[in-house]
Amino acid sequence: FIGGTFCEMFPEEVVLVPRNNREPETNEVLYFISTTTNQSVFSNLHIDIDTNLSIFVDVLEKCKNKDITFNFISSIFVYGNDILNAKETDCCNPRGFYSITKRCAEQLLVSYCETFGIKYRILRISNVYGLDKTVSSGKNVLGYMIGLLKENKDINLYGGGKFLKDYMFVDDVCRAIRVVLEKGNQNEIYNIASGTSMLFVDIIQRA
């Protein structure tokens, strides 16, 4: 979703690597491979482990002894429940299985890069919305619910929608990622969020 949009927005700056290819082809690696929800915890735990950790380690191995910067797309949810006021220096306390594997990948990245002298950046992305042909209740939930509203279908809001969310439009997220790639310091963590929170029910009502 985000990776595809990034490629569409900056096609002349991107070398798209096939998913089954582990070799870096540029000196700036932008790593998007990831699950996107906590739903696999109810069906197959190995999906998150295999996708978020095993493949990730395979790619890291191919980056050894190469002059690259590894830019890892992580999630703001590694902070845990209090994500709206989180700073990059705050302690992480991930709660869901997805965010736990993302935090584990972050720690693997830092350890591996320090061991083998690889430069890195970690980008923690907030909730993202935008046009996506594959929206579902588990992926891009806001887009999914807006789609239901357009079809005049009922939607069920957990807790009445009385919880805060920080949403960014996918194009803005991609622009922010590009800024970090161009100007961000190496071996640093960057939060990418709007900085504005709203009740989820209010977002749906505005939609």
Provide a role label for each language-model segment.
Residues 29, 57-97:
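Conserved Rossmann-fold NAD(P)-dependent oxidoreductase catalytic core, especially the SDR/UDP-sugar
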Residues 1-33, 37, 137:
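N-terminal Rossmann/SDR dinucleotide-binding element
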Residues 22-51, 62, 78:
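NAD(P)H-binding glycine-rich loop region in Rossmannoid oxidoreductase-like domains
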Residues 43-58, 92, 96, 100-103:
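Glycine-rich NAD(P)-binding loop of the Rossmann-fold in SDR/ketoreductase-type enzymes
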Residues 38-39, 72-85, 97-103, 115, ...:
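Conserved catalytic-site region of short-chain dehydrogenase/reductase
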Residues 81, 93-121, 126, 149-151:
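Active-site Tyr-X1-5-Lys
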Residues 103, 116, 128-143, 153-154, ...:
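Glycine/proline-rich active-site loop of Rossmann-fold NAD(P)-dependent oxidoreductases
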